[in-house]
């Protein structure tokens, strides 16, 4: 089921505020996607750590570059830095009234920082500043732990029978 966050009603929970505080030493910048070997190396490290059995682990540099740079829509990357060193990123699409989070990757040695959630929270902050109405998070699959985190964002809506419903 597809999911989205209606941003006008979104409130940062205690846990989300804690994650933001825990990562307040990180800087972020939004840029147009441009691949390089540093990003690719971090991406491959992330895949090896988080998704070692997934289809993307065999992704070549050319495929990675295509994912980042070739899109029929306006795609951007939210970059994370610590002490001017690249730390992680979220690839997302920009539409008139919504953002769509596509893929995140980050340095896996910092898993206790909840960087996947942190990247979503930073994108929510940015979207709210830009008066964006929705953030689409992709599919929710209850049985898949790596995709079930999406219901932690409240309110959340799911697409059911071609209609968006609160979940």
Provide a role label for each language-model segment.
Residues 3-112, 152-153:
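A conserved beta-strand-loop-helix scaffold within acyl/acetyltransferase catalytic domains
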Residues 98-102, 132-137:
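Glycine-rich phosphate/pyrophosphate-binding loops
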Residues 121-133:
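Conserved acyl-CoA
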Residues 43, 120-123, 150:
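Residue-level preference for non-acidic, small/hydrophobic
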């Amino acid at each position: 089921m597809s999911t989205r966050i209606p941003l006008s009603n979104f409130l940062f929970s205690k846990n989300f505020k804690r994650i933001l505080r825990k990562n307040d030493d990180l800087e972020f910048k939004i840029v147009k996607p441009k691949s390089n070997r540093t990003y690719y190396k971090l991406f491959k490290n992330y895949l090896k750590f988080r998704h070692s059995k997934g289809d993307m682990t065999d992704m070549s540099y050319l495929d990675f570059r295509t994912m980042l740079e070739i899109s029929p829509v306006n795609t951007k990357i939210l970059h994370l830095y610590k002490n001017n060193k690249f730390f992680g990123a979220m690839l997302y699409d920009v539409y008139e009234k919504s953002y769509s989070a596509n893929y995140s990757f980050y340095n896996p040695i910092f898993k206790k920082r909840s960087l996947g959630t942190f990247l979503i929270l930073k994108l929510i902050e940015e979207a709210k500043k830009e008066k964006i109405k929705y953030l689409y998070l992709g599919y929710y699959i209850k049985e898949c732990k790596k995709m079930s985190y999406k219901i932690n964002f409240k309110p959340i809506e799911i697409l059911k029978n071609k209609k968006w419903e609160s979940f």
